[in-house]
Amino acid sequence: MPHLRLYVPEEWLREDFKASTGFDAGRLLDHLVRVVADLRMENPAPGAPAKEVPMINLSNLKHAIVPLTHAHVGGDPGQRFLHVTLAAGNDTPGRTASVRVRAAAVLGDEVDRFVGDLPGLASVTVHVKDIDRDRGYSTTAERKKRRSAG
């Protein structure tokens, strides 16, 4: 199951901040969900008629805003940051490191365009990473299947 997380300073989630700056973290997350849904990668199936396929299955995407407390840059309480994490299984053929790098660039560009010159924003970072099932990742569906089998 892929995950999309938008990490936002908690004070930027308040109505007064939204009213004074126009920044709406919920709208940004909704926009990023659409961007992720549109991400494509080369079809790994040889000879397939479709040259590209979706990078993730949107119906499986879990997404959330994660509020950050005491979130500063370089010890400066006047400087804040946004961070986006997209995690998707590495067991999907074709979802290579270069695909993840391209996805990170696309997501970063979209956040940059969305926030514009937001006061106090010092940094936007994006991390597109693997979910490696061989390294301790499990899902509810997998655990239920295992329990019912034995």
Question: Where do the model's predicted regions map?
Answer:
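A domain-level signal for the structural core that forms small-molecule/cofactor-binding pockets
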Residues: M1-G150
